[in-house]
Amino acid sequence: MPDLLSIEGLRAGYGEAVVLPGMTLTLAEGQVLALLGRNGTGKTTLINSIVGITRRFGGSLALGGLDITTMRPDQRARAGIGWVPQERNIFRSLTVEENMTAVAQPGPWTVEKVYEMFPRLKERRNNFGNQLSGGEQQMLAIGRALTLNPKVLLLDEPTEGLAPIIVEELLKALGTITRAGGICSIIVEQNAQKILGLADRVVILERGAIVHDAASHALKADPAVLERYLGVAGAAAH
């Protein structure tokens, strides 16, 4: 299967600080990658670098064969990079539906399809973003990213701070997205066990470099790897 996302020798960071000293990573269409690591290992920096909001010191990025290295974040979004940041960044002064129609691009992920996945959003379609609970805001952030009909979906700790019942609903939705095919996903998640059942590949970062890259079932069978790189088996730090 051809690579959908290709990162080659990426050196990136903030200001003069290099956080990623030379990242090389590829993802195939439909692949779901769980990105794990302790706090400060470069997970969010990698996500932000794909989005285009870090300083790039070197290296290249390609999406479906298209060189996006020098593209602005808005150009990358139109090219097919969907992003759900930790802060969610929904439009609080727009309604649920307006949040999605404002960015929607033609494709299989329509507003109505998002409503099928998140019935709660349909019930709140005329409510403003600032009237939603934290879980509803996260559903909206994911739904809005999907209506862009991205090729790559980036989710930075999508379940952080949410009630267990909402977490289960979100994980079920993420499973629906991955089964729909066509999109490759990178998910940063602080609880490894929570995400291993969803991902088919796991990458662990340490000091901005990949120290483990394997199928998720292999990591399940070797909890010592989680213990070694994350400190506590089954739990990944921010």
Predicted segments with their positions:
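Catalytic Walker B motif of ABC-type/P-loop ATPase nucleotide-binding domains
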Residues: 153-157
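Helix-to-loop junction immediately C-terminal to a conserved catalytic motif
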Residues: 51
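Helical segment within the ABC ATPase nucleotide-binding domain
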Residues: 168-181
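ABC ATPase C-loop
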Residues: 145-146
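Conserved ABC transporter NBD signature motif
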Residues: 59-66, 79, 109, 113-116, ...
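The feature captures the beta-strand-to-loop junction immediately N-terminal to the Walker
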Residues: 36-38
